[in-house]
Amino acid sequence: MIRRIEIVRAHINLVSPFRTSFATEVDRNLLYVRVVGDDEEGWGECVAMAAPLYSSEYVDGCEEVMKRYLIPMISASTTAEEFVQKSAAIRGNFMAKAAIEAALLDYQLRKANMSLANFLGATQTKVASGVSVGIQPTIDDLLRVVAEYRADGYVRIKLKIEPGLDIDRVRAVREAFGPDMLLQVDANAAYTVDDAAHLAKLDEFNLLLIEQPLPEEDIVGHVELSKRVGTPICLDESITSYDVARGALDINACSIINIKPGRVGGYLESKRIHDLCLSRGVPVWCGGMLETGIGRAANLALAALPGFTLPGDTSASKRYFTQDVTTPFEIVDGYIDVPNTVGIGVRPITEVLGAMTSRVDSYSITK
């Protein structure tokens, strides 16, 4: 039986600044959910940023929603599936919901002696690892960083782009590393449909995809863009649920989907989107939100499902952190092993997380 829910707040620095079209991150304000029962526990990680720049959610807001609305929904016997049904009454707040769902899943699967990978239906024991490269100060810096990641064994490179820092940089990387390297770009909604002719210039570089070129709300605009750009369009920020994913596919707004559990409300909804795409022959891949090992472990389990045919952003721990809160994930010959023990397969290292933690709030479950 569940006895209490803990909200753990902590802080971790990134090994280097990570710049996108909308922000530069140098650290992460962490929010973990810990479900504590009589003889077991479960952990979930909230992926929201400190400010509402990627989406409308932000980490302090997620904590408030958890405390005021989501945790009071949980009883001693609530399962992840039941929580998803109950929390549907609260609009949006997908990242807050996803963190609690993940902790409940970890808890109940540990009690059932089952791994998250097996629960979701994973068919792979390791997943191909790609890496996301932030916008660099110069092209020379970009080439140096890409070379380092290639040396580390990453099988796919993703370049963050924005207007004015796109075509020349992609050309430089393609020329430096050859036509066979798996390469894609991510705009994080930095362009408009009026930029279609400009984005079409990317077609010559044989990219896997262009990720989220237009604003989140402009799904219809992506339909028009898909007609004018030869490179496959992948949606990220726009896809916030199964229903949105189905609608986007129905109108041909994209031909690839990036599934991020935090963005869609959790791993159960992520699996529904995966199953939809698999049934339609639409490739998916697992995106990243600079997760520590707790979130990364769960993402690896998801990325091991059969429809995840493109390398995701499930990079090694050292890509982002000098010291992760869990035993670090390592890349070996381009792949990262999927945790195969119970639950998400990892737990935080008590001493490490303790040194990073600023506050732990505990909420008793009495009903």
Indicate where each model-derived feature is located.
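Structured beta-strand/loop patches that form or line metal/cofactor-binding pockets in enzymes
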Residues: 1-41, 47-54, 320-322, 363
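N-terminal amphipathic alpha-helix/helix-capping segment at the start of soluble metabolic enzymes
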Residues: 1-9, 110, 114-126, 329, ...
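Metal- or metallocofactor-binding catalytic centers and their adjacent structured scaffolds
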Residues: 4, 35-36, 41-111
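C-terminal extensions of enzymes
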Residues: 5, 322-367
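Conserved, mostly hydrophobic/aromatic
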Residues: 33, 39, 100, 113, ...
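A cross-domain feature marking catalytic cores of carbohydrate-active enzymes
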Residues: 46, 131-133, 159-161, 185-189, ...
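Metal-dependent enolase-superfamily TIM-barrel catalytic cores that perform enediolate-based chemistry
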Residues: 117-229
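Shared catalytic-loop signature of beta/alpha-barrel
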Residues: 217-234, 239-335, 339
